[in-house]
C-alpha cells in the first residue's frame, strides 16, 4: 500500500539543548539534538514518502533513521539563507513597542526572545511549498509534521503507513482547545501576541494546490 500523503518536516539545531533551568530558562524548555532525534525515530519509522530539510551535519542521522525508506533530504545553511529575516525578528523582539504589549508571564517563552525559534516555526509553509515547487511531491496530499511531534509511541500507534482520505478542497488544521470564535482579524492577531493557543502548529494537511493558497495567506499575515 502506498500512502496518498507525503510528509514534510525539518530540523535545525537552534541551541535548545542549552535552555536549561540552571541557566535561567523556563522549566522543561531544554531539548537536545539527541532528544529530538529520539522523537523522530517514531515519525521516521513510517513508510510514507518524506521530504526533510536539515543542516549538512545532521543529514547522515536523518538518513540512518529512514534506513532506505523513500526519502529526500534537502540541506540548508539556515543561518546564512535567512540571515536578514532572523535579524528582523530579533529587532522586533527587542522593540519596546512589542515587549510592552506582552503579559509578563510570556516573557520566558521562546516565541518572545529567540529569533531562531520564531524563524524555524514560521518556515513550515515555506518548506512545504519549496518541496512542491521543486517537483518533489508526487502524492495528492501533503502533511507538515513537526520533526519532534511523535514524543510518545502511541502517537503513531504502530502504523507502518499513515493514510487518511482528507478532503482535498480544504486545509486541515487540528485544535487542542475548544471554544474559539473568530470575530475579526484583529482578534486573531491579539490571540497570537497573547499566546492563546487553540490550533496545533505541529500537524497540517492539505492538497498541493491548497498549500500554495495557504502559503500566500501566511505571507500576508
Q: Where are the regions a protein language model picked out?
A:
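Beta-strand cores of modular interaction/reader domains in eukaryotic scaffold and signaling proteins
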Residues: 6, 51, 143-146, 172, ...
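Alpha-helical structural motif
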Residues: 81, 124, 206-210
Amino acid at each position: 500500500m502506498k500512502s496518498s500523503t507525503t510528509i514534510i518536516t525539518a530540523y535545525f539545531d537552534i541551541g535548545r539543548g542549552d535552555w536549561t533551568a540552571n541557566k535561567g530558562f523556563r522549566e522543561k524548555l531544554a531539548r537536545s539534538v539527541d532528544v529530538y532525534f529520539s522523537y523522530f525515530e517514531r515519525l521516521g519509522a513510517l513508510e510514507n514518502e518524506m521530504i526533510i530539510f536539515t543542516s549538512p551535519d545532521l543529514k547522515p542521522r536523518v538518513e540512518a533513521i529512514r534506513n532506505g525508506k523513500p526519502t529526500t533530504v534537502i540541506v540548508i545553511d539556515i543561518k546564512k539563507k535567512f540571515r536578514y529575516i532572523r535579524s528582523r525578528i530579533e529587532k522586533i523582539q527587542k522593540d519596546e513597542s512589542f515587549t510592552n504589549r506582552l503579559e509578563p508571564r510570556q516573557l520566558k517563552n521562546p516565541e518572545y526572545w529567540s529569533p531562531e525559534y520564531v524563524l524555524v516555526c514560521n518556515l513550515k509553509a515555506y518548506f512545504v511549498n519549496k518541496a512542491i515547487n521543486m517537483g518533489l511531491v508526487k502524492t495528492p496530499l501533503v502533511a507538515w509534521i513537526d520533526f519532534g511531534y511523535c514524543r510518545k509511541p502511541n502517537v503513531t500507534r504502530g502504523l507502518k503507513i499513515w493514510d487518511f482520505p482528507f478532503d482535498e478542497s480544504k486545509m486541515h488544521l487540528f485544535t487542542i482547545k475548544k471554544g474559539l470564535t473568530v470575530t475579526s482579524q484583529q482578534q486573531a492577531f491579539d490571540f497570537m501576541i497573547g499566546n492563546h493557543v487553540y490550533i496545533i502548529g505541529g500537524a497540517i494537511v492539505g492538497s498541493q494546490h491548497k498549500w500554495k493558497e495557504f502559503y500566500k495567506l501566511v505571507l500576508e499575515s
